[in-house]
């Protein structure tokens, strides 16, 4: 039960995307991997899941993933600035080089 495991959804709510409808669910599962001394258990995987889903939503909406995120970070200039800087430094929107290892 999520009420018993407060860290289950850790990292899933960290990004403050303005989503008009959002619901998170937790289904407990014993996968046999002890996590007692694993630092940042849920924060190490949940943000990846959230961002992957944001990519899927952007594709479904037919919108560039960076533009989609910026739209849902409205009113959060610091977060928008970080995303814009990451996109610029990562050369987002530029074609990939036609060299081995890039395709």
Set out the residue ranges of the language-model regions.
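Structural signature of cysteine-dependent C-C bond-forming condensing enzymes
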Residues: 86-97
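Glycine-rich loop/linker segments at domain edges
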Residues: 1-52
